Amino acid sequence: MYKVLAGVGSIVRTLWMVFTHITRKRDTILYPEVPAEEIVPPRYRGRIVLTRDPDGEERCVACNLCAVACPVGCISLQKAEKEDGRWYPEFFRINFSRCIFCGMCEEACPTTAIQMTPDFELGEYVRQDLVYEKENLLISGPGKYPDYNFYRVAGMAIDGKEKGQAQKESAPIDVRSLLP
């Protein structure tokens, strides 16, 4: 008789727990149905992109600091030079199968050309598809820093302006006049 009462009590307790948990909010997130904005934290470091400056030209000056800062060596690029003396990457390649999304390349970039986006859907069936070229990485906008232009701040001569006339640039200093 005790075993029968214990069995019935166990069944009643189980049903009670099931019906009380049915109305609770789920802990598991159903990813495809839930928008990505609700899943990804605000400072999530996802896919890497190359941005353009406000004038529409690519920001990357092929300084190679991102490749040096990368702890796993997944970034490779080759420098080329335009007629006006501006450097640009002839090719820029990131192997996302090796990337650990640490953000060191973004911190090392002096022109803010490399930026991390909250995009996390990078799954591919073929490993070679995880190697992104410059054409895949380059976006049409300036990204997080819409007003920043490296060449306005860096002091490179701009067509139509003399040295010292660019934005936030002081006039050149004559060092000889400072000597005694």
UniProtKB/Swiss-Prot annotation:
Top class in the EC scheme: translocase
Signal peptide range in chain numbering: none
Reactions listed under catalytic activity: a quinone + NADH + 5 H(+)(in) = a quinol + NAD(+) + 4 H(+)(out)
Subcellular locations according to the entry: Cell inner membrane
Chain positions recorded as [4Fe-4S] cluster 2 binding sites: C70, C99, C102, C105
Cofactor binding description: Binds 2 [4Fe-4S] clusters per subunit.
E.C. number(s) listed in UniProt: 7.1.1.-
Pfam families (alphabetical): Fer4_7
GO BP annotation list: aerobic respiration
Residues annotated for [4Fe-4S] cluster 1 binding in this entry: C60, C63, C66, C109
Co-factor requirement: [4Fe-4S] cluster
Highest taxon of source: Bacteria
Keywords: 4Fe-4S, Cell inner membrane, Cell membrane, Iron, Iron-sulfur, Membrane, Metal-binding, NAD, Quinone, Repeat, Translocase, Ubiquinone
Stored SUPFAM superfamilies: 4Fe-4S ferredoxins
Xref: InterPro entries: 4Fe4S_Fe-S-bd, 4Fe4S_Fe_S_CS, NADH_quinone_OxRdtase_chainI
An example Gene Ontology molecular-function term: 4 iron, 4 sulfur cluster binding
Protein topology in the membrane: Peripheral membrane protein
Record's subunit section: NDH-1 is composed of 14 different subunits. Subunits NuoA, H, J, K, L, M, N constitute the membrane sector of the complex.
NCBIfam families membership: NuoI, PRK05888.1-1
Family to which this protein belongs: Belongs to the complex I 23 kDa subunit family.
Protein name as it appears in the record: NADH-quinone oxidoreductase subunit I
Native species: Acinetobacter baylyi (strain ATCC 33305 / BD413 / ADP1)
Lineage: Bacteria, Pseudomonadati, Pseudomonadota, Gammaproteobacteria, Moraxellales
Gene giving rise to this polypeptide: nuoI
